[in-house]
């Protein structure tokens, strides 16, 4: 092989508990995604849950990252095998699964990414991920090079964090701070002490099971605190947030 698909460097870095600094991509544009890739982030989330992304918009973004060292991570809209299969076939190896609340849901996400007998992924002999049949060892290598990160963002997920983190095939735990805050009765206030304490608890339980933990933290002070608490993969901003802040600052400079 000469295409450097394997090994999955992001999966290797997570397993080694290496700090990985990332960014969120929500504008669904190959141009902005390419710019993010050139910035030097270790990983990028291409959001399919809250951003207007689907297969047709994600393929150009994967192409835009072809020459980048940033690992593309897709957040699927839901933990559904057919959706996950389509993302696998277009070339994603790293998955962020939203709203996982039980060990069974975590195991289902893992199974959706594995070919039988280890999982339930459907087989296509020619697709973008295996360079349309030109990667000879794709089937032998694929199962062990998929990264599964599950999001904990509800009270039930918090209650089951140990079982979720212990699930075979789960590579990392990701905290969804906004939804977690809402579930705890603090909508719009992820900085509430109770929410922060719960985030720290999730990190600790993930670490106890040898699993790296991550979070989205667009405020620098928050990101640095989470890193101090043991988070190893942190998204420190988003293309949408940076674009909005930058354009607002530019307008204010001349309009006020």
From Swiss-Prot:
Catalytic residue positions: 50 (proton acceptor)
| Biological process terms in GO annotation | D-glucarate catabolic process; galactarate catabolic process
Example GO molecular function term?
2-dehydro-3-deoxyglucarate aldolase activity
- Which metal ions or organic cofactors does this protein require, according to UniProt? Mg(2+)
Q: What is its EC number?
A: 4.1.2.20
Q: Name one GO cellular component term.
A: cytoplasm
The metabolic or biological pathway listed in the UniProt record of this protein is: Carbohydrate acid metabolism; galactarate degradation; D-glycerate from galactarate: step 2/3
Keyword set for this entry? Lyase, Magnesium, Metal-binding
Question: Catalytic activity annotated for this protein?
Answer: 5-dehydro-4-deoxy-D-glucarate = 2-hydroxy-3-oxopropanoate + pyruvate; 2-dehydro-3-deoxy-D-glucarate = 2-hydroxy-3-oxopropanoate + pyruvate
* Keyword field contains Signal: no
Q: Which residues form the signal peptide?
A: none
Which InterPro entries does the annotation name? Aldolase/citrate-lyase_domain, GarL, HpcH-HpaI_aldolase, Pyrv/PenolPyrv_kinase-like_dom, Pyrv_kinase-like_dom_sf
Q: Is Lyase found in the keyword set?
A: yes
The feature of type site (Increases basicity of active site His) is located at 89
Query: Site (Transition state stabilizer): which residue positions?
Result: 75
Question: In the record's cofactor note, how is the cofactor described as bound?
Answer: Binds 1 Mg(2+) ion per subunit.
Q: Give the residues the record marks as binding substrate.
A: 151, 178-179
Question: So where does Mg(2+) get bound?
Answer: 153, 179
Q: Which family does it belong to?
A: Belongs to the HpcH/HpaI aldolase family. KDGluc aldolase subfamily.
Name the PANTHER family on file.
Answer: 2-KETO-3-DEOXY-L-RHAMNONATE ALDOLASE, 5-KETO-4-DEOXY-D-GLUCARATE ALDOLASE
Q: How does it assemble?
A: Homohexamer; trimer of dimers.
The role this protein plays is: Catalyzes the reversible retro-aldol cleavage of both 5-keto-4-deoxy-D-glucarate and 2-keto-3-deoxy-D-glucarate to pyruvate and tartronic semialdehyde.
Question: What is this protein called in UniProt?
Answer: 5-keto-4-deoxy-D-glucarate aldolase
What organism is the protein native to? Salmonella arizonae (strain ATCC BAA-731 / CDC346-86 / RSK2980)
The lineage is: Bacteria, Pseudomonadati, Pseudomonadota, Gammaproteobacteria, Enterobacterales
């Amino acid at each position: 092989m000469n295409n450097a698909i394997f090994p999955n460097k992001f999966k290797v870095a997570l397993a080694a508990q290496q700090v990985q600094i990332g960014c969120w991509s929500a504008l669904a544009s190959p141009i902005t995604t390419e710019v993010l890739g050139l910035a030097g982030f270790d990983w990028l989330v291409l959001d399919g849950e809250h951003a207007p992304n689907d297969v047709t918009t994600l393929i150009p973004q994967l192409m835009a990252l072809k020459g980048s060292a940033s690992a593309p991570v897709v957040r699927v809209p839901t933990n559904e095998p057919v959706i996950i299969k389509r993302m696998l076939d277009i070339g994603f190896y790293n998955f962020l699964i939203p709203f996982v609340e039980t060990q069974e849901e975590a195991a289902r996400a893992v199974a959706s990414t594995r070919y039988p007998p280890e999982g339930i992924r459907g087989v296509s002999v020619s697709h973008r991920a295996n360079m349309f049949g030109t990667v000879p060892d794709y089937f032998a290598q694929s199962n062990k090079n998929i990264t599964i990160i599950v999001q904990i963002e509800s009270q039930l997920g918090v209650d089951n964090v140990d079982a979720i983190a212990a699930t075979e095939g789960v590579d990392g735990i990701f905290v969804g701070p906004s939804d977690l805050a809402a579930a705890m009765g603090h909508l719009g206030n992820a900085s509430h002490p109770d929410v922060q304490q719960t985030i720290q608890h999730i990190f600790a339980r993930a670490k106890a099971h040898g699993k790296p933990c991550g979070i989205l933290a667009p405020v620098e002070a928050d990101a640095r605190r989470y890193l101090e608490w043991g988070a190893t993969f942190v998204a420190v901003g988003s293309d949408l947030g940076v674009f909005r802040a930058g354009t607002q600052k530019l307008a204010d400079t001349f309009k006020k």
